[in-house]
Amino acid sequence: MKTNCEFPLLCLLIVLVANVEGEVEDNELKMVKRLWRNWEDPEQRQLLDQEAEQEKQREKRLWRNWEDLELRQLLNEFAENQREKRLWRNWERRQVANEDDGEKPKELWRNWEDLKRRQVGRFE
């Protein structure tokens, strides 16, 4: 079990209090004692600090990757919506050009916009 404690005195106190109350197993107490010895040893403390820093960097990298993925998904969704709107505008223009009565394409366009609004409302 790999554990690292930023506040070894606090960790030791918590485990000791829990041990007095009988809530800590021997191996957990041994782990805390080992952590405390490592904390007292400058080389071990430096290794623990490096491991903690590497873990923080890894978490930052994972977070950035997740944010990048989320942004790409939003951009793709936006691009798809823009593409749909462009297709419908082009379709509407062709309908208006082909028909004498320009109300029907406008009504279809309004129906399509209402449908999209209802779909968005359903997912929010």
From Swiss-Prot:
Record GO terms (molecular function): toxin activity
- Indicate the principal place this protein occupies in or around the cell: secreted
Q: Where are the RLWRNWE repeats?
A: 34-40, 61-67, 86-92, 107-113
- Specify the propeptide location in this chain: 23-94, 112-124
Keyword Repeat in record: yes
Taxonomically, the superkingdom here is: Eukaryota
Transmembrane residue ranges: none
Tissues where the protein occurs: Expressed by the venom gland.
Post-translational modification Pyrrolidone carboxylic acid, affected residues:
95
Family designation:
Belongs to the scoloptoxin-08 family.
The molecule here is called: U-scoloptoxin-Er5d
Q: Where is the organism placed in the taxonomic lineage, from the top?
A: Eukaryota, Metazoa, Ecdysozoa, Arthropoda, Myriapoda
